[in-house]
Regions:
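Sec/Tat signal peptide C-region and signal peptidase I cleavage site
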Residues: 17-23
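Anionic-ligand-binding alpha/beta catalytic cores of soluble enzymes and soluble regulatory domains
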Residues: 292
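Bacterial N-terminal signal peptides
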Residues: 9-17
Length: 469
C-alpha cells in the first residue's frame, strides 16, 4: 500500500509528538556536585555573608525522559536562584546535550545557604558570562555534565504515583494583625496575630520510576522555604535531608527533590502551643527533611502504575503588567537604598526588622522599574509524559495558592509544580494577596492580575500538550 506524500509530510510536521510503535519510554538520572569554594558570597538575606564552612554539599540533579523521538531533562539545583543567568544556563545545557532549549527545565530549590549566582535585579537577563565568576562559569559545566550523565543513563522505565501529607512543618508566614494590617513573620507568640492569610500546602507528591537493570528513581515534591539554618555555612537545607532519607531507607533508589510554590510559607510556627519545644535551628531542617522523606518512603509501595507516553515540552510566554512606582516616590526610594548600601539599616523607616526589610524591598522595586518596562514577557515552562505526568515551572517564588490551583485544574494525572524554573521574577503573590500590603507584595514587580495570567497561561499550555499526547 502506498502512503500519500501529503500524509508523510503531515506526520513529519508533528514528529515532535509522535512515538514509534517500537520506541520504549526511558528515564535516566545524573548528579554532579556544585558546592562553591569558601569565601563565596551567600544569597538569601539583605546583608553580606561569606561562606566560612560547609555543613553539607550542594548538588545538581537531572532526570532525563525519552520516548524514542523526544527528549527532555528536568533538573533540580541546590541554589537559591540563577537570577539573570537562567537563559544562558538553559541554552548552555541544550548546546552541550543536543536538546531543544525548550526541553531544558532547571528548577532551584531556593536554599538560603548557597551561593549568590547571576547577581542582578529580578527579571533582568545577562547576555554573556563575560563578567561571571569562575564559579558561575564552572556551574554551567556541572549542569551540562549532570544532564549528559542522565541522558547517557537512559533505561526502559515504568511510572507510578502517590500522594500523602507532611503535616506541621510548613506554615503560612503572612498574618492578619489586630489593627487590620498584614505582616510577614510577625514573631512567635505575638499577641496581635489574628490568623494566617492563606493556606499551607502540606501535600507530598511522589513519582516512582522503576527502570530495567538500573536503580529506581524517586521524584519527591513538597513546598516550603528552605531557610531554616542561617549563618555562614554552605548547606542545601532540608531538601538534601529529603533525598538522604529516601536513599538511605529504600534499596537501590536515587532521589530528586522538586520544591513547589513556597513564596508565602516557611518553617516558623507562630503559635507557642503548637510548637515543639525540642526543635532548634540546628535540628529543624533534619526534622523537616526526614518527615517529608518519611512520607515518600511510606508511599513508595503504594504507588499506582500510570501509563507512560509521549514526552512533550514547551516554554510559552504571557504578558503581565509591572508594578511601577510614582515619580514622587523616587527620592525616598533612593535614600532608603543608599542607607542600606552604607550599612545604616537602623535609619531605614520601620519599627521592626521586617518592616525595614519591607521598606528596602519596595525601594528597590521602585528604582528598578523607574524607567519601565510597563509589561514583562513571563516564561512558563512545562514538561509532560503522556497523560500521566506534568512538570509545571514558574520563574519566581509563587505563593502556595498557585500550586494548589494548578494541581486541582490540570488535566494530567499528577502535576508537579516547581518554583524558580528557568527564571526569577521575585515574589509572585496571589491576586487576593495583592489587595494587602506586606513584604512580598510591596516588593513585587507585579500587580493584581498576575495570578490569573500565570495560572490560565499554564493551564492553556497543559491543555495543548495534553491534546497532543
Amino acid at each position: 500500500m502506498k502512503i500519500k506524500k501529503s500524509v508523510v509530510c503531515t506526520l513529519a510536521a508533528v514528529a515532535g509528538f509522535i512515538v514509534s510503535a517500537k520506541a520504549e519510554f526511558m528515564v535516566g538520572y545524573g548528579r554532579e556536585d556544585v558546592t562553591p569554594p569558601l569565601g563565596t558570597h551567600l544569597s538569601g538575606y539583605f546583608h553580606e555573608r561569606l561562606a566560612d564552612g560547609i555543613l553539607d554539599p550542594l548538588d545538581a540533579i537531572a532526570v532525563a525522559f525519552s520516548d524514542g523521538t523526544n527528549r527532555a531533562v528536568v533538573m533540580s539545583l541546590d541554589i537559591i536562584s540563577l537570577r539573570g543567568y537562567f537563559d544562558l544556563y538553559r541554552e548552555g545545557v541544550a548546546a552541550a546535550t543536543g536538546l531543544d532549549p525548550q526541553a531544558v527545565f532547571i528548577a532551584c530549590t531556593h536554599t538560603h545557604t548557597g551561593p549568590l549566582v547571576g547577581s542582578c535585579r529580578y527579571g533582568k537577563k545577562l547576555d554573556s558570562f563575560e563578567r561571571a565568576s569562575n564559579y558561575e562559569k564552572w556551574l554551567l559545566d556541572q549542569l551540562a555534565s549532570a544532564a549528559k550523565i542522565a541522558l547517557n543513563d537512559l533505561a526502559p522505565a515504568k511510572l507510578g504515583i502517590a500522594r500523602g501529607e507532611a503535616k506541621g512543618i510548613s506554615f503560612i508566614r503572612r498574618y492578619r494583625m489586630k489593627d487590620g494590617s498584614c505582616r510577614t513573620n510577625p514573631g512567635v507568640g505575638n499577641p496581635d496575630i489574628v490568623a494566617p492569610i492563606g493556606e499551607a500546602d502540606e501535600q507530598v507528591q511522589l513519582v516512582r520510576v522503576d527502570r530495567t537493570g538500573k536503580p529506581s528513581i524517586a521524584i519527591v515534591n513538597f513546598q516550603c522555604h528552605p531557610d531554616t539554618i542561617g549563618g555562614n555555612k554552605i548547606s542545601a537545607d532540608w531538601p538534601r535531608v529529603v533525598r538522604e532519607t529516601v536513599e538511605s531507607v529504600l534499596d537501590d533508589v536515587k532521589c530528586v527533590f522538586v520544591n513547589g510554590p513556597q513564596g508565602d510559607s516557611n518553617h516558623i510556627c507562630t503559635d507557642p502551643a503548637k510548637r515543639s519545644p525540642y526543635l532548634t535551628r540546628q535540628t529543624v531542617y533534619k526534622h523537616m527533611g526526614r518527615k517529608i522523606g518519611g512520607v515518600a518512603v511510606g508511599l513508595w509501595d503504594e504507588c499506582r502504575p500510570v501509563d507512560v507516553g509521549k514526552v512533550g515540552y514547551s516554554i510559552a510566554k504571557v504578558k503581565v503588567k509591572s508594578n511601577r512606582g510614582r515619580p514622587e516616590q523616587l527620592p525616598e526610594a533612593e535614600r532608603i537604598v543608599a542607607l542600606h548600601r552604607s550599612g545604616q539599616f537602623a535609619k531605614i523607616p520601620g519599627d521592626t526588622g521586617m518592616q525595614k526589610t519591607t521598606a528596602c524591598a519596595e525601594a528597590r522595586r521602585i528604582l528598578q522599574l523607574a524607567n519601565g518596562p510597563d509589561y514583562f514577557d513571563f516564561p512558563l515552562s512545562t514538561v509532560t509524559i503522556g497523560e500521566a505526568l506534568a512538570f509545571v515551572g514558574i520563574p519566581g517564588e509563587p505563593f502556595t495558592g498557585y500550586g494548589i490551583s494548578m494541581k486541582k485544574r490540570s488535566p494530567f494525572t499528577m502535576t508537579v509544580s516547581a518554583c524558580l524554573v528557568n527564571g526569577n521574577f521575585g515574589y509572585l503573590p496571589t491576586d487576593e494577596a495583592f489587595k494587602e500590603t506586606g513584604y512580598e507584595t510591596q516588593g513585587s514587580l507585579f500587580v493584581e492580575g498576575l495570578e490569573k495570567a500565570i495560572v490560565e497561561g499554564h493551564l492553556e499550555q497543559l491543555e495543548r500538550l495534553f491534546k497532543n499526547k
